[in-house]
Amino acid sequence: MMRLSSYLRRFRWLVFTGWLLALVPAIYLAMTQSGKLTGGGFEVAGSQSLLVHDQLQEQYPDQGAVSLALVAAPRSDASYQDMNDAVALLRRIVSEFPGVSEVPNPTQLPPRPDRPYGVSLRLDDRNSVTSDVAKQLRTKVGIKGDQAGRTANGKVRLYVIGQGALSAAVAANSKHDIAEAERWNLPIILIVLLAVFGSLAAAAVPLALGVCTVVVTMGLVDLVSMHTIMSVFVTSTVSMFGIALAVDYSLFILMRFREELRSGRQPQEAVDAAMATSGLAVVLSGMTVIASLTGIYLINTAALKSMATGAILAVAIAMLASITLTPAALATFGRAAVKRSVLMHWSQRSECTQSLFWTRWVGWVMHRPWISASAASTILIIMATPVTSMMLGNSLLRQFNSSHEIRAGVAAAAQALGPGALGPVQVLITFPDDPNTQASSPKHRQTIGAIRNRMLQAKNVMSVAPPQFADNNCSALLGAVLSVDPEDLGARETVDWMRTELPKVPGAAHVNVGGPTALINDFDDRVAKTEPLMLVFVALIAFVMLLISIRSVFLAFKGVLMTLLSVAAAYGSLVMVFQWGWLENLGFTHINSIDSTVPPLVLAMTFGLSMDYEIFLLTRIRERFLQTGHTRDAVAYGVSTSARTITSAALIMIAVFVGFAFAGMPLVAEIGVACAVAIAVDVTAVRLVLVPTLMAMFAQWNWWLPRWLSRALPAVDFDKPFPPVDLNEIVVLPADISATKVPCGDLRMVLKLAAKLKNLAPDAICVADPLAFTGCGRNNKRSDRVLPGAATQESEEDPAMGKASDSTAALTAAQVGPVTRTNGHWTARNLVIGLTHRNSITRVMPWSDRPVHPFTLWRSRFSVAIDALEAHIAVQADAPDQPNYQRCSPVETAHVQLPTGDRLLIPTGAETLRLVSYLIMCRNSIRDYAELADMVDAIEPETAAVVLTELDRYYSCQLPMRQWMATQLVRRLSDPHPVDLTEDQWSDPDNKAEWQDVRQRCLSVAVAMLEEAR
């Protein structure tokens, strides 16, 4: 992955060009879809319904031709003339379409104003795509959206019905639903991403990848639909999973990139490290999702295979975009993606820091593993219990609201012809034992008559038409019109009865029952019989992928088991929401059965999606375990550091699914609800409760892997794909500091002063700085006292922070900042006043308790350094009679790694002490003593003494005399007499007390220097 990342960075403009070349034609294809998406595809290979369907197409052209119907439905004020004109209009429209003809219906009464009238149509070979013809007919009759067409006077409504019309209406509805869902999804996703990253540039990367994934996949789906059957529901599936997965995958990589930058890596190294960890996890996760979706092919029906194909394309494009476009984008816009907006206070915590809340939570559940596991398991089992009541069904018609024109048209046709006339049960009778005999021969007519009489005895059968014989006279066809709708459960019962009873009729006949009802029945039976096999296949795929990623038998088995619980809970939610109608008031349709396409899709998709979080979390835990060898510590660390990323990704996914659940048709809503519940359960009860508790219970068994299996598995290691960070002498902002908001004034001033320092000290050298953050802790000093000439405050070291000399724990008292001149008197204020970090946490804290940001501290250091260097130049130029303090060595600076990957040169803490001491020697002002006293508050007199006793190595005035500078500094610090101290300043008791404090602190440094010299 690192080599791939390196190539992608180097040739990023080629990557952008390639995706642009794929995006442009995809946009065209997505906007001008060919209309070949179908509402069918439910045929089952080898089933009776498919056999009957094929025989009708081959041997019964009048019965098996694909047809549509136009319906004229009168209003209560319509007349005979209105109906005649409407029917004439429909026939005139039909005549305008080549290859479309009317099928006479002798049983239908002439047009009347008290009942609808239907015009049945037949399409020849010139119109192979029925939905295209249906779209044109809908336009001709004036159908707009879900509103029916009307005649000129509005007294007769016009409809287009049939399989092609259903497909066209579903396609139109899908476009509308996708637009509505994205109107909800995109703002929600943007808000979540802004909350996570605190940067519009960072939030734009995953969002752009999501949109790109959906558009490219839509174009591919349109190309595939030209060569194979693709369901109209593919568009919703692609949009739903494409944007969710693309945003999630790029989110994982971008979060790791920011984390690596904050650990001290350069931007290019951070991109490679992110790809070697999160990028590899994305590849494994995407492959797991794709492998899980291939399980749907086991069902072997065109509708489900097409939806699986669309989902696989969406996952593949999302994965490909994430691992190619993301590193290219980060190499180009990485710095902008890392910078946090100063207006976004909610996202100030770093991605890689451990959350105190989640650390405590994991500790609590691991301390009570049996209670926690029992409670979580009980909740999941309760949610899964309704699965036993799940009823499977299938209906295109119920995908529309009751007010939709397609349902009104079907209802009008049922009123004109009868509810079962639109989908008769078709019984095909063959005589395989006597292939040379004609089906219409007298010896077989008696058997056919007996079968027809038996059909009339079936429940819900209104009439059975006389037998029709095939063109080759080898079979006979009987059509039964039912008294119920073909999609009604009663119609299914009738089909089941016929399949059981008709073969028992005496004779040598072979009976196959087909028709629309039998077709759906066969589809549902195939799903019910094949889903257990699919479950085993998907679970095995997930187990193998987890085994490769985690290299643990127990963790892989546990991951599969936990995902099964999530899927069961999702199935239970389907029953509660749709079958039982618990959320009907929120707009979810109350239906009698769950669409049979939903359970296998949800099973494959949720299994794959859950692997995202499983792999991401467990690889974090394993990485920590390999470092420490302690399971509980590894679990606490893994959960607390990844909880924010997992929660953010889950929120995005749930938002997408919920958006489609509310905006989509019932079938899409079912998928959205089930996936949203599965993800919500997975990231709460499973990842945050069951995973830590079970790992705490099994301790070292979590990591058991037989040696033979370890040798057999491919080597995919997440913890050693790239070299460790070599910081050398670079200062890296700690995560808890780098995540805080930098005061804008301090940031601008530091950058300005850094450039000025580079000009004043071009020969500066870089060294390590153990005092880089000394003075950034909480300020416990008084901030309301003003010195007679320079102000300072008492400081107390925070014992929790440790010694100031420790570079990692030296976040102690606050550093004093710049002073101001007011009415001729020097006044100094603590940096806390007006310069401290103000975020949502510290805003409610007293000024004296707020932490000091490093940039505020470094601004003070820069001020001292610039002041000293400018004073040195001024003394040499304007005061040749003063002592000539020569600099003996270059100015010492330190490299600071910023969160953006940029590096900044700052004066070291020791150099700042030397420079302020130089100012005391050459200028001897109140301000200089006050600044030194306040620096001593932060670093302790002993630490200052260690630095200042070596002052003669950096400055010299009397070359023959050794330690002259340090000796003179001790004299001045032991009894300060600044040149700008006046008698008027002693009149104020507060000023006098402040000056005594400064003298005392300076004296403590002088004493410490004498002790150090011994």
Curated annotation (Swiss-Prot):
<keyword id="KW-0812">Transmembrane</keyword>
<feature type="transmembrane region" description="Helical">
    <location>
        <begin position="235"/>
        <end position="255"/>
    </location>
</feature>
<dbReference type="GO" id="GO:0005886">
    <property type="term" value="C:plasma membrane"/>
</dbReference>
<dbReference type="Pfam" id="PF03176">
    <property type="entry name" value="MMPL"/>
</dbReference>
<feature type="transmembrane region" description="Helical">
    <location>
        <begin position="649"/>
        <end position="669"/>
    </location>
</feature>
<feature type="transmembrane region" description="Helical">
    <location>
        <begin position="279"/>
        <end position="299"/>
    </location>
</feature>
<feature type="transmembrane region" description="Helical">
    <location>
        <begin position="188"/>
        <end position="208"/>
    </location>
</feature>
<dbReference type="InterPro" id="IPR004869">
    <property type="entry name" value="MMPL_dom"/>
</dbReference>
<feature type="transmembrane region" description="Helical">
    <location>
        <begin position="311"/>
        <end position="331"/>
    </location>
</feature>
<feature type="region of interest" description="Disordered">
    <location>
        <begin position="783"/>
        <end position="802"/>
    </location>
</feature>
<comment type="similarity">
    <text>Belongs to the resistance-nodulation-cell division (RND) (TC 2.A.6) family. MmpL subfamily.</text>
</comment>
<feature type="transmembrane region" description="Helical">
    <location>
        <begin position="598"/>
        <end position="618"/>
    </location>
</feature>
<keyword id="KW-1003">Cell membrane</keyword>
<keyword id="KW-1133">Transmembrane helix</keyword>
<feature type="transmembrane region" description="Helical">
    <location>
        <begin position="373"/>
        <end position="393"/>
    </location>
</feature>
<keyword id="KW-0813">Transport</keyword>
<protein>
    <recommendedName>
        <fullName>Probable transport protein MmpL11</fullName>
    </recommendedName>
</protein>
<feature type="transmembrane region" description="Helical">
    <location>
        <begin position="671"/>
        <end position="691"/>
    </location>
</feature>
<feature type="transmembrane region" description="Helical">
    <location>
        <begin position="530"/>
        <end position="550"/>
    </location>
</feature>
<dbReference type="InterPro" id="IPR050545">
    <property type="entry name" value="Mycobact_MmpL"/>
</dbReference>
<feature type="transmembrane region" description="Helical">
    <location>
        <begin position="13"/>
        <end position="33"/>
    </location>
</feature>
<dbReference type="InterPro" id="IPR000731">
    <property type="entry name" value="SSD"/>
</dbReference>
<keyword id="KW-0472">Membrane</keyword>
<feature type="transmembrane region" description="Helical">
    <location>
        <begin position="156"/>
        <end position="173"/>
    </location>
</feature>
<feature type="transmembrane region" description="Helical">
    <location>
        <begin position="560"/>
        <end position="580"/>
    </location>
</feature>
